[in-house]
């Protein structure tokens, strides 16, 4: 799952407690783009330039974001439960999270959708291990937006993938168990 921290309640005029979006598309990929402002691979404001070859749609559909609106919250209350797994290897590049609200999507509820209701931090000065964003409030007809070292505070909940050696050992153990059982019954 992916979760975001809501802004504290002093920003309630921009947030509200709940907002529903009729359709979002969430993709994950690895990317050569960097969060380091001084890097020649700094995240591009041309969105397609950031997406890796292993791009995977991990969620698509309606979603409701709800917050308790408590003062100075540090809880990650805006949650997207992913429907498709993504295997990330740091050696393949940086992790790119891309959230798109397709043209024609609607919102309802007292809150707003976009950059305003989520808490963010600035990675200034930028660093290779930091975070960066590219964003666009316009339509899909505008594939170029803005980029920044300010980034949404995001929590990724992960499940480690079993190592190939672990799977092999489990297979060897299973074969040995079956062989032992056959000897006892013979």
Predicted regions and their residues:
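Proprotein-processing/basic-patch segments
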Residues: 91-160
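Hydrophobic residues positioned within well-ordered beta-strands of beta-sheet architectures
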Residues: 24, 78, 152-154
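Aromatic- and Gly/Pro-enriched, solvent-exposed loop/edge beta-strand patches characteristic
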Residues: 19, 27-122
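Short active-site-adjacent helix-start/loop capping segments
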Residues: 10-13, 35-36
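Short, charged juxtamembrane terminal tails flanking transmembrane helices
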Residues: 183-186
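A short, hydrophobic C-terminal helix/tail in secreted or cell-surface proteins
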Residues: 162-180
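A short beta-strand element within beta-rich, extracytoplasmic domains
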Residues: 1-9, 97
């Amino acid at each position: 799952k992916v979760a975001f921290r809501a802004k504290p309640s002093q920003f309630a005029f921009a947030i509200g407690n709940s907002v529903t979006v009729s359709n979002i598309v969430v993709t994950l990929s690895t990317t050569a783009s960097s969060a380091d402002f001084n890097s020649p691979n700094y995240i591009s404001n041309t969105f397609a330039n950031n997406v890796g070859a292993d791009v995977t749609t991990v969620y698509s559909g309606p979603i409701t974001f709800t917050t308790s609106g408590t003062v100075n919250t540090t809880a990650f209350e805006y949650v997207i439960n992913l429907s498709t797994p993504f295997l990330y290897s740091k050696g393949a590049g940086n992790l790119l999270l891309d959230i798109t609200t397709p043209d024609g999507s609607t919102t309802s509820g007292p809150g707003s959708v976009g950059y305003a209701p989520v808490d963010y931090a600035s990675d200034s000065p930028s660093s290779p291990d930091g975070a960066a964003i590219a964003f666009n409030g316009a339509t899909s007809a505008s594939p170029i937006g803005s980029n920044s070292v300010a980034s949404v505070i995001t929590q990724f909940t992960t499940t480690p993938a079993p190592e190939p050696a672990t799977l092999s050992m489990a297979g060897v153990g299973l074969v040995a168990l079956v062989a032992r059982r056959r000897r006892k019954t013979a």
